C-alpha cells in the first residue's frame, strides 16, 4: 500500500481569505493567526488576498465566487458567531457551515470552515489565540495540506 501525504509548505500556493467585520475584535485575531501561519509555512504575502464581508452569513457566497475564479488553491473562511438569546445563532451558524461545505464540494476547491461557533465571547477569544491556539492559523494549515494533497492527486 502506498501512503500519500502532503507537505505543509505554502511556497507555490495562492489563497483567498474571507473574514467578517462582525465580531471584529475576535475575527481580527483569527486573521492575524491565518496570515502568520501562511507566511511561516513559506507563503508569500502577495499570494494571500483578504476579502471582508459584513457577517458570517455572507461568507459562503463570496467564498464560492472566489473558488469559482480558479485563481486560488484554497479559500479560508473566518468569522465568529456567538450564541445569544434567540434562534438567530442557529440560522447564521448553520447557514455558514452548510454554505462553506457546499462551496468546497461544488467547486472542488478546498474551503476552510474557520468560523467560530461559541456560547460566549470568552470561548471565542480563547479560540482566537488567547488560550486554545488560533483557529485561523489552524484553518490555514489544513488548507495548505489539503491543497498540496489535491495537487499530488491531480499529477
Swiss-Prot record:
Gene3D superfamilies (UniProt xref): Lumazine/riboflavin synthase
Disulphide-bridged cysteine pairs: none
InterPro entries reported in the protein's UniProt record: LS, LS/RS, LS/RS_sf
The protein's annotated pathway: Cofactor biosynthesis; riboflavin biosynthesis; riboflavin from 2-hydroxy-3-oxobutyl phosphate and 5-amino-6-(D-ribitylamino)uracil: step 1/2
Domain of life: Bacteria
Binding site for 5-amino-6-(D-ribitylamino)uracil: 22, 56-58, 80-82, 113
Binding site for (2S)-2-hydroxy-3-oxobutyl phosphate: 85-86, 127
Signal peptide: none
Keywords linked to the UniProt accession: Riboflavin biosynthesis, Transferase
EC number of this enzyme: 2.5.1.78
Reactions accelerated catalytically: (2S)-2-hydroxy-3-oxobutyl phosphate + 5-amino-6-(D-ribitylamino)uracil = 6,7-dimethyl-8-(1-D-ribityl)lumazine + phosphate + 2 H2O + H(+)
SUPFAM superfamilies: Lumazine synthase (SSF52121)
CDD domains in the record: Lumazine_synthase-I (cd09209)
GO biological process: riboflavin biosynthetic process
The family this protein is said to belong to: Belongs to the DMRL synthase family.
Function: Catalyzes the formation of 6,7-dimethyl-8-ribityllumazine by condensation of 5-amino-6-(D-ribitylamino)uracil with 3,4-dihydroxy-2-butanone 4-phosphate. This is the penultimate step in the biosynthesis of riboflavin.
Identification of the protein by name: 6,7-dimethyl-8-ribityllumazine synthase
